[in-house]
From Swiss-Prot:
A lipid is attached at residue 24 (S-diacylglycerol cysteine). This is Fusaric acid resistance protein FusA. A lipid is attached at residue 24 (N-palmitoyl cysteine). Keywords: Cell membrane, Lipoprotein, Membrane, Palmitate, Signal, Transmembrane, Transmembrane beta strand. Gene3D superfamilies: Outer membrane efflux proteins (OEP) (1.20.1600.10). NCBIfam families: outer_NodT (TIGR01845). It is found in: Cell membrane. One of its GO terms (molecular function) is efflux transmembrane transporter activity. InterPro entries: OMF (IPR050737), OMP_efflux (IPR003423), RND_efflux_OM_lipoprot_NodT (IPR010131). It comes from Burkholderia cepacia. Residues 375-442, 476-530 are annotated as: Disordered.
Length: 530
């Protein structure tokens, strides 16, 4: 049987714990105002369901489908020397450092203090008298302190997880910016290719119109034509010259744009040759939509990591309502008499050890306000959809719209170019060049030029739409097997994320392995597995 003293001690301990817990500040009615929606619960829509499902996910170097080595070179240059690339890598390193700072709070802390002071001791009623009254001595102390915070409520652990989630979100944001840079380079390069094609048509049209003007002048010299015919034939030449100048200016502007995206001067773009783009890849969608897309779109991954970090912030805010218990220990030496090293003698040593407890009782509503802010910060989407995201979301519709245009332009080219253009010389040989026939010839030439002029924009639109589709599918980002929300310790906020993680085949990994993986991710500028 327990002695009465032991029973009394246990009763006092239970009473003390009860009073401590009751004395803590109240959380009030603070709870998250939103819940996460499962990806598989969303309707993908008839367009996605009817799309080709054999295309597969894009590769990390998806732009190589254009089969242009010069494009590959400039994308690599943009990735290495973009002006904001260093800033993105710096933000990733900063987030990694903050994660290490949060991690250090979970470990024991050892601090040393050394004080070497020459002191004059007073001689009065309050501070003296005594053996040291009105004397000058050394007051030297040296201590070594150990402190360890007992994380009974998971505050330090959740703070570390929040910092790691923030680091993952920063790395995913950096990868999203890198993908956007790749798309911008491809878009500028495709625009240059289109302007080169339009420039060829403008030169061809100008030469054709100049030959018609020469023919009109010869007719005038032979007495078969009029000055009006010459003026009509020459009136469009300045317009064609201005078109040539505008296309050449657009090409030069694209060169400067590519040089700027690569972080180089305008002169670097002068070495860019004419693009040789060729795209045979079909426009289709992967077989697992939309659940797998959550783990492949870097902007979506960043938003999910952000929501995950906000959920950890709720746990940190809740833990602030409970008592803090620290284990403290100090050992040191103290000396106030001669010699100078008197404090190092064993007889002058001392130590302290024991727990230290602090608890919030009245804090003016500060903790409840912090918890309310943490709950309000958790939003289903994590952040608003940006204009770039809307463009990517609309990009998958463009290939289907560009293909008919390209097909119609190709049919028009074969019809007008294959049938009418060979007949023009025969018509010119059989019929005398009368004014009405000159006008008919000019009309046929204009129809041919119009059909050809529509083809480059349609082809360019298809090439750009392919880049937008690759970006909308994530650009070949590999985020690893661990995804946001795969840790069950999130409680209510993680329950809704478990289904998307399971749908994409995600498996949680040990938290101890995360810092090294985050560091590797930051070095590469891409989100890594947690």
């Amino acid at each position: 049987m327990q002695s009465p003293a032991t029973k009394g001690t246990l009763a006092l301990a239970v009473l003390a714990v009860s009073l401590i817990m009751a004395g803590c500040a109240s959380m009030g009615d603070n709870k998250p105002q939103s819940a996460r929606i499962e990806a598989n619960a969303l309707d993908a829509g008839a367009a996605i369901r009817a799309a080709d499902r054999d295309a597969g996910w894009p590769a990390a170097d998806w732009w190589r489908a254009y089969r242009d080595p010069q494009l590959d070179t400039w994308i690599a240059a943009a990735q290495a020397g973009x002006p904001d690339a260093r800033g993105r890598r710096g933000r990733v390193r900063e987030a990694q450092a903050m994660a290490r700072v949060a991690r250090s709070a979970e470990l024991p802390q050892i601090n040393g203090n050394l004080s070497l002071m020459r002191q004059h001791w007073p001689d009065n009623v309050y501070y003296g008298p005594g053996p040291l009254a009105n004397t000058d001595t050394w007051n030297n102390t040296g201590t070594l302190g150990l402190s360890y915070h007992l994380d009974l409520w998971g505050k330090d652990k959740n703070a570390t997880e929040r910092a790691l989630d923030t680091a993952h979100a920063t790395a995913a944001d950096a990868r999203a910016a890198k993908l956007e840079l790749e798309v911008n380079v491809v878009r500028a390069y495709v625009g240059m290719s289109m302007n080169y094609a339009l420039l060829d048509l403008a030169h061809e049209t100008f030469e054709r119109q100049r030959s018609l003007a020469d023919l009109a002048r010869k007719r005038l010299q032979a007495g078969l034509g009029t000055q009006l015919e010459v003026s009509q034939a020459e009136s469009t030449l300045p317009d064609y010259e201005r078109q040539i100048d505008s296309y050449e200016e657009a090409i030069q502007l694209a060169r400067h744009q590519l040089a700027a995206l690569a972080g180089k001067g305008p002169g670097a773009g002068d070495a860019i040759k004419r693009p040789r783009l060729s795209l045979d890849a079909p426009a289709g969608l992967p077989s697992a939509m939309p659940a797998d897309l959550l783990g492949r779109r870097p902007d979506v991954v960043a938003a999910r990591w952000t929501v995950d970090a906000q959920a950890r912030g709720i746990d940190v805010a809740k833990a602030s309502f409970y008592p803090n218990i620290d284990l403290l220990a100090t050992v040191g030496g103290f000396g106030v008499t001669a010699p100078f090293t008197d404090f190092l003698r064993a007889m002058n040593g001392g130590w302290t050890a024991g727990p230290a407890l602090s608890l919030p009782i009245f804090e003016g509503g500060r903790l409840r306000a912090q918890l309310g802010a943490a709950n309000a910060g958790v939003r289903p989407g994590g952040r608003a959809i940006q204009p770039d995201d809307r463009r990517r979301a609309q990009g998958h519709r463009r290939p289907g719209r560009a293909d008919p245009f390209a097909r119609y332009a190709e049919e028009g080219r074969r019809t007008l170019g294959g049938r009418q253009r060979p007949q023009l010389p025969a018509v010119a040989r059989r019929l005398p060049p009368r004014p009405d026939r000159l006008r008919q010839r000019a009309g046929r030439a204009a129809a041919i030029v119009g059909a050809h002029r529509k083809r480059p924009p349609h082809r360019s639109e298809r090439l750009a739409a392919h880049a937008q589709l690759m970006a909308a599918l994530g650009g070949g980002v590999e985020t690893g097997t661990d995804v946001p929300g795969s840790q069950s310790s999130h409680g209510e906020s993680a329950a809704g994320a478990a289904a998307p993680a399971a749908a994409s085949g995600a498996k949680p990994v040990a938290a101890a392995a995360r810092p090294a993986q985050v560091a590797a991710a930051g070095a590469a500028g891409v989100p890594a597995a947690r």
